[in-house]
């Protein structure tokens, strides 16, 4: 049991976080609400805050990144097929599974969430998620920056009804927003006709993904409820999606703001007082020196993505020049106790180019882009300062990205691909392997044509029986 002193100390810590973010609100009351929502059963609260240490992971930890529907069978819903695939072909080789958003959604293959507390019925149900969590450490996304225009909250916004009417960040279209850092090229504000008139909603990623207004503490309260529910269903590792964009402030770049870091610290305080071992991973696809700030003082993320690795590793293997990759490995400081890097070559997104800023000369970037396009890849753009479009990411299957050099395709694709994976596995940190890298999947041109989105090239859905046959045949690339 937990004594009152434990709760009092926790309330004081939470109140301190909240006062930084919400100085004009009753932060003591907010802290009490958060504790009651996060710990409806106080037996799940530990008496003393966990001390950051190195016992959260070890050299055997590997994460598999997959969609709930990446492997399919006509016999059952996809989450059950995924679990069957894991047991048959992965076993205990990989200890953690990151299932990308498995909620009802309207866009972006899951990242436009309609209902945070339900499993997409086309994938399965909560019992399927819980079954996977019994066999593997489960990682899931908290899509915290934005939600779907089809959600109940946004429909309330359109109708000017509580609580959703105050959940979204809006701005006057006449406002100068030129300082805002953009990951996309569409207009930042999306107009909507609401019951109270025309309003312009901040939409960092698409017109169907509307940004929440965290200056309203009720939005934070909602996500505390969501976190508590995910923990109950077996999630232990939380990927904070697009977290760098969380707090918006007119007249600033609206990225990496102090309030964003403080909210992460608040979540870390909650996690550090929970009886379960809970891990925060921040998804911040930004230049490396900015990315490193998300460790905080061992009081923010436990793990940050090594976003600089995929583009610099790709560049090294396509050019034969490892200078820039070596600079990265030498410049990344050894992680402090309780912190580490998530190393990867590819994910469900493209190979990001923002981390190359200041790390790779533009001429080298241009050569790499040309090679990737030769290998069938695509290049997605973002809108930079002054409205100038810049390359944002390379969209390609990582196996296809390794098919040659700047001079074109050659016979060393498999060797080059295996070298990339070996380098990634050898670096300090936790390795993460995307399912389409594990299975050496080819570019999905049909998927791109179907969706109209470049990222679909590396988000194919595979037939369970076919992939099982390929893995059983030692002569196939998949088996290699």
Predicted features and spans:
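Active-site and adjacent substrate-binding regions of carbohydrate-active enzymes
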Residues: 2-480
